[in-house]
Structures are given as C-alpha cells and as structure tokens.
C-alpha cells in the first residue's frame, strides 16, 4: 500500500513539474509578425507570401520570396509597408498597424525568404 501511495505522489508531483516547464508561447517579432501577416497580408500575398492571393490584381501582388524582394533593404520594405506602393493594390498600413507591428511583419517576411 505504501508503494502505491508513494508512486501516486510521485506521479502528481511529476505532472506538476512538467506543466511548469512547458515552453512559453513564441513571442518573437517573427511570430507576432506572422499573426499580423495572416490577418492582413495573406489575402493578396498568399499564405506563403508568393503573391498568389487575389489572382485578378493587376499588377499582381509582390512575391515576397522572390530574389528582388530578398535584396531590398529593411528600410525599403518598411517604407512599402508603411506607405504602400504606387500604382498597385498595396496600400498604406501606417494607420492600421502600429510601428512595432510593422517591424514584426518585416521580421516575418524575412523568414519567408529563407
């Protein structure tokens, strides 16, 4: 009987320890940016960022995985996110996203390019 009680107590204590050591939620800029990207950018840029969202846009949305976008500086991409891109459907996000969210989206876009 004592062995069963000891085993039971060890299981309860072990379960409590396991719950405390669970990994915290991913709160990196790229993880936060992914959430914003999924909410705001996927309709046009597509789930993988390849510009395959709305097929009827002319010109089509940028393929964020393309070599041309990979070679742009962070400053260039931040300007595009903040202010949009002339003569395209890419509008300004500066009044919708906070500055932190814009940087987070940029961090996520950079992960699409690897």
Residues of each region from the PLM?
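Electrostatic cytochrome c docking/interface patches
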Residues: 17-36
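Short, surface-exposed glycine/acidic/tryptophan-bearing loops
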Residues: 53-55
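Extracytoplasmic electron-transfer domains, predominantly the class I c-type cytochrome c fold
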Residues: 58-111
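Detector for the c-type heme attachment site
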Residues: 18-19, 44-50, 82-83, 110
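Positively charged n-region of N-terminal signal peptides that target proteins for export
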Residues: 1-5
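Bacterial N-terminal signal peptides
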Residues: 6-15
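The canonical Cys-X-X-Cys-His
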Residues: 33-47, 105-109
